[in-house]
Amino acid sequence: MSANSSSLATRVMRGAVAMLLLRWVTRVLGLVSVAITARLLTPDDFGVMGTASIVLGLFLNLSSSGGGEVLVRMKNLEPDHVHTVWTMRLLMSIPLALTLFLLSGPLSVWLHEPRVADVIKLVAFIPCFEALASPGPTLLAREMNFTRLFYLRVAVKFISVIATIVLAFVLRDYWALVLGQVSAALALIVVTHAFWP
């Protein structure tokens, strides 16, 4: 086995371990968040947020651009390619947000849950916030630098969990969960641009 093959195998193994750890750490942090917020909020609050998340998830699946995958697989990656994908992702997220915003009223009527309307209006813009993040994490995946990617994802999750718990103590309703999701998107912007301007 050549030195390059051995180095690649080592990086793949480290990446697999880092991604496995990431999955477990984020799950543990998520369980901590749920365990605490469940004592402060009602099942109804979780239902409102869950409904809005399902709606957002469906729209995101329909509008997925796959730009990140393109950057990872491209052989000769230039800065212009990165800038183009970043711009396209942002431009695609804006009509998605506006569509969801305008459909929030009819969707809340269809779902027989009037509180969902205002929640959808806010979570609709989460993809826009996430699109403003630096493409650094995608470039880390391309370079197979999964250890650094692990720290980034854990930092964002940790900030989101702390924000959600604090908001649950203060607000005592479903808006704590909604704003917790927004805080995760904002944390992603701050953390990625702090390390990859």
Regions found by a protein language model. Give the residues of each.
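C-terminal transmembrane helix end/exit motif
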Residues: 1, 68, 135-142, 146-147, ...
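Substrate-agnostic recognition of the 12-TM MFS/MFS-like secondary transporter fold
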Residues: 83, 88, 92, 134-157
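Short hydrophobic/alpha-helical segments at membrane-entry points of transmembrane helices
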Residues: 118-120, 176-177
